[in-house]
Amino acid sequence: FECMEAIELVPNTDFISSVLAEIKSRWGNGLGVTLSLGEQEESVYQKWRDAGAHRYLLRIESSNPEIYKKLHPQGHSFERRVECLYTLKRLGYQLGTGVMIGLPEQSLLDLAHDIEFFAEVDADMIGMGPYIPHHDTPLGKSIPITPEYMEQQLLLGLKMIAVTRLYLHDVNIASTTALQALAA
């Protein structure tokens, strides 16, 4: 059989709008709807907001533009991602974003800047999880993935969550399955 190496899923904006309208017609504003459909034009975000979406998740992964660039395909813009976050907030969405913790070349200062970034964009929800390389990838083969390494990643993740909670005491911080996997 044929195998597709990669596809880009582009949401059908009219379909999403119709689903949102149906939810709103059945439950009014009593049911909060969260979307996570990537970067869109402002008009699309507005259309979905008008149709009944309340929250939007769009992870930054790293507030360091150089690290961000290494995580995303060529031609993908850090500035565009940040612009989308500010647009979502301005349109009245509860904003969710987040980062990976323990990325290669990521420093503690980068993580501190990530927390400051959450405050700057006025994030309402934050998802943070440890970066866990797979042993069959080039990076996974370059890092000895030992129990000690996994323990360090777990502790770094817990510390990041704790410091974020101290700095941003009223934000929702999601628990991640990746963090749970390290604790097992």
Kindly give the residue locations of the regions a language model identified:
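Histidine/acidic-residue-rich catalytic or RNA/ligand-binding cores of hydrolases
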Residues: 138-141, 183-184
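Short amphipathic alpha-helix initiation/capping segments at coil-to-helix junctions
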Residues: 150-157, 179
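Core AdoMet radical
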Residues: 1-14, 19-84, 94-101, 124-128
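Catalytic cores of alpha/beta
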Residues: 40-50, 103-119, 180-184
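Conserved C-terminal portion of the radical SAM core fold
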Residues: 1-3, 54-55, 79-138, 154-174
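Short catalytic/ligand-gating loop segments at beta-alpha or beta-beta junctions
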Residues: 174-180
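Short glycine-enriched, charge-decorated loop/helix-capping segments at active-site entrances
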Residues: 70-75, 142-150
